[in-house]
Amino acid sequence: MINNLKTFILLASLTALLVVIGGLLGGSTGMLVALLFAGIMNFSAYWYSDTLVLKMYNAEPLSNNHFVYHIVSELAHRAGTSVPKVYLINNSTPNAFATGRNPENASIAVTTGLLDRLTQEEITGVLAHELAHVIHRDTLINVVSATIAGTISGIANMFMWLSMFGHSSNNEEGVHPVVGMIMMIVAPLAAGLIQMAISRSREFEADAGGARISGNPQWLASALLKLDQANHEQYFDEAETHPATAHLFIINPLNGEKLANLFSTHPSTAERVARLRAMY
């Protein structure tokens, strides 16, 4: 409940930041343009982001006879939700993610490395975690937050280019060039931090929800420890090529030697494991 409230506050803050930036740059018209732009991007992301991300990772659909599909199907029926489509990514780095605009149009993807490295119980824990993301509609929340953050960065970049070519605003509703330059630097950073905080909050909720669906928090805790270790041992090439998708995965797939928690899309594995173990 606390994490859900936190997510709402963070999304509201992200939207407010977008409106403020639009207002500073273009007054009331700027506010409307910023919201309209974000709305168009969110509409596109809502309908097409799942297809796009699956293509990015060359994910192939698994047959209904595959044991992973059977696990997902059993977990979905246990949770009383639709059975997502299941995909396999041919990559030796163990990881997984969920995508889709709602439970009826959701997909779960796992890597070959995850199936090779984890036990069936640990795989079940991971799949339950991803199913919890689907049930909580975290895939939609993440798309919205990423889109708004991206819009803020885009507006900041646009202001930078306009300033470079001498097109800064001089009207009453315009913003002073110095203030604009400061905002250009600070706003994308603030938006990114808020987006990352939303992602971290949703991971905790999915951990708890997944543990309840599988019936054993230890399965996910054990899987997270193995996945975290693997993340230190090898690179996930496709994820490094598409860093904007890092927040989708159960473990941060990027190998940048552990930035401070403030700048991470995921909570620390140690804290996640501790919370899971405290459930029993």
UniProtKB/Swiss-Prot annotation:
First-listed, main subcellular location of the protein, grouped into a coarse class: membrane
EC number(s) stated in the UniProt entry for this protein: 3.4.24.-
One Pfam family it belongs to: Peptidase_M48
Bilayer-spanning residue ranges: 7-26, 30-49, 146-166, 178-198
A single GO cellular-component term on record: plasma membrane
Cofactor: how and how many bound: Binds 1 zinc ion per subunit.
Subcellular location field: Cell inner membrane
Keyword check for Membrane: yes
One Gene Ontology term from the biological process aspect of the record: proteolysis
Gene: htpX
Keyword Transmembrane in annotation: yes
Keyword annotations: Cell inner membrane, Cell membrane, Hydrolase, Membrane, Metal-binding, Metalloprotease, Protease, Transmembrane, Transmembrane helix, Zinc
GO terms, molecular function: metalloendopeptidase activity; zinc ion binding
Active site, per annotation: E130
Membrane topology value: Multi-pass membrane protein
Protein family (similarity comment): Belongs to the peptidase M48B family.
Cofactor(s) needed by this chain: Zn(2+)
Enzyme class, broadest EC rank: hydrolase
Protein name in the entry: Protease HtpX
Superkingdom of origin: Bacteria
InterPro entries per record: HtpX_protease, Pept_M48_protease_HtpX, Peptidase_M48
Residues annotated to bind Zn(2+): H129, H133, E203
